[in-house]
Amino acid sequence: MAERRGPALVLGLLLAMCGCKPGWPHFDAPDGTFSAELPPPLRVEAERIEGSQRLLSVESHGNEDQAFLVQRRRPVPGRRLDPTGVLDGFCAEFARARSYEITTDARGRRRDGRAAQTCAFRAQGLEIRIQVVAAGQCVYTLMAMWRGPAPDVDRFFDGFRVLEDCPVDQNPSP
């Protein structure tokens, strides 16, 4: 019996040292527009209207020192959104509104080719990384916040997928 434990122990140590991580819960948007992977526990707020836009939020508060958020914004029916305009100046406006120090502000494209703005901020020991992604008439905000050791933010950003661009909704609600 001891002979069998040796290889199992070696395999276990090898897996632990190679960084195998448990999977995060997978969230699929009810309308099929996006999917995301966030650490548990997840809290989902149903889509709601705020002014001229509709918001859907998914968040994770693994512990009091870190949080992850995915928020989808799209216009109410009959309105249009300029996604590129939303990306322009996002980092500066976000920092100015909250008195945060900008540590990163970069425009580029995600692996899927979608336009994105990436920002990082610091304020009173709080670290924040945000990626804003344009997808048709939707704009997604991916936010990671933490104090102390950094969580796996790249895993969070890479686990987000736009599955379908949001189309223009021409029919205003009655």
Identify the residue ranges that each predicted region occupies.
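Bacterial signal peptide processing site
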Residues: 19-23
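Post-signal peptide N-terminal segment of mature Sec-exported envelope proteins
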Residues: 27-50
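Bacterial N-terminal signal peptides
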Residues: 8-18
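N-terminal secretory signal peptides that target proteins for export/translocation
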Residues: 1-4
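A short, amphipathic edge element
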Residues: 95-104
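Short, well-structured beta-strand
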Residues: 52-82, 87-91, 110-174
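Beta-strand-rich interaction surfaces with strong enrichment in secreted/lumenal proteins
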Residues: 26, 105-108
